[in-house]
Amino acid sequence: MREIVHIQAGQCGNQIGAKFWEVISDEHGIDPSGNYVGDSDLQLERISVYYNEASSHKYVPRAILVDLEPGTMDSVRSGAFGHLFRPDNFIFGQSGAGNNWAKGHYTEGAELVDSVLDVVRKECENCDCLQGFQLTHSLGGGTGSGMGTLLISKVREEYPDRIMNTFSVVPSPKVSDTVVEPYNATLSIHQLVENTDETYCIDNEALYDICFRTLKLATPTYGDLNHLVSATMSGVTTSLRFPGQLNADLRKLAVNMVPFPRLHFFMPGFAPLTARGSQQYRALTVPELTQQMFDAKNMMAACDPRHGRYLTVATVFRGRMSMKEVDEQMLAIQSKNSSYFVEWIPNNVKVAVCDIPPRGLKMSSTFIGNSTAIQELFKRISEQFTAMFRRKAFLHWYTGEGMDEMEFTEAESNMNDLVSEYQQYQDATAEEEGEMYEDDEEESEAQGPK
């Protein structure tokens, strides 16, 4: 089977990673000690994608837990599903990265990275036919962002032909831990643009807004935000974990979703949005699910898709429902909103249906969009970055770990290039496409969008 090796790095990465394993273990009928207690063959048919079956018929996640300080991993280990993980796969330092990207990427993280790679190798040798890696991390801290991106480039070196997929939590001033988040995020995005195949942008700003506006939670906690993240991660991995035809592995998803190699930052969405521990009273209809999942309020990235255009979209519907109705609704949305889909990629919306709904819902839908509106998120970070960088505020923490200012300038311009590329394809029309390629590449970039 086609296995995926999961890596979680840093405090945020370990918390959303642990939550992800709780949710999918529940969906596959795996109890906290790794025994199968489910009731459907569908749960086991592709279980080997994420789990390794040990000799005692126990299922062990193909997960590697990494952090530069022991705190978060101790709480994962003592949490509900702590005994599920392989004890050797907990790798941690003692020093911490102090929210400093340079410590995670160049100094502290670099010392720990080889012992992580040993475990990665061991997990990959356990695989029959590895399809790729997924990393959960945040971009605002030190370990997840700095060491996370270091791991990506090291793993990439060793497994160049395997897919690299990340769930990256993007920082926001609304839910901020540190003042240097824009630095860490910009340096990380500089790496992600070059070294990953698929990145789901999970945006703390959007999660906070959903909790506050839609779920009416007065003071959202990280637990509430992580509940949304785990619902989304469970949704976007559905077609990898359950039998089906569409986007059944990471590479097929990448082929459908990524028209240009640098533009691989996806906007996830989920419907229906429910608060933690609440029961849903009424099953939604397919039209309602479709309506909601294309709604800006349901996006996990704080960007308004109406400000851009979709290059590609993949959706997953879960639960017992009529395929015909799903197809009709999806076509209806596309024909009503055709101006929001680029016309030079025909059939750019793909739909998968899985019979098994998530816990507590009769039906749900998950949305993965590659929209040019994601540039709003990069612009937001870029503005915060520039405000500090032009005064060289806080730079000594980074140069003190051996970094050069030049690296900051490069990261800044790479992110600005990314924004212009999204803008260029947002403005492109089918007629102009031909001319665009005839021009010299540099020339068209110098002119910006036509």
UniProtKB/Swiss-Prot annotation:
Changing T178M: In CDCBM1; can form tubulin heterodimers that are properly incorporated into microtubules; the microtubules are less stable than wild-type. It comes from the Eukaryota. Mg(2+) binds at E69. Residues 429-450 have a biased composition (Acidic residues). The modification 5-glutamyl polyglutamate is found at E438. CDD domains: beta_tubulin. Its main location: cytoplasm. GTP binds at Q11, E69, S138, G142, T143, G144, N204, N226. Pfam families: Tubulin, Tubulin_C. Heterodimer of alpha- and beta-tubulin. A typical microtubule is a hollow water-filled tube with an outer diameter of 25 nm and an inner diameter of 15 nM. Alpha-beta heterodimers associate head-to-tail to form protofilaments running lengthwise along the microtubule wall with the beta-tubulin subunit facing the microtubule plus end conferring a structural polarity. Microtubules usually have 13 protofilaments but different protofilament numbers can be found in some organisms and specialized cells. This is Tubulin beta-3 chain. It comes from Homo sapiens. The lineage of its organism: Eukaryota, Metazoa, Chordata, Craniata, Vertebrata. The gene is TUBB3.
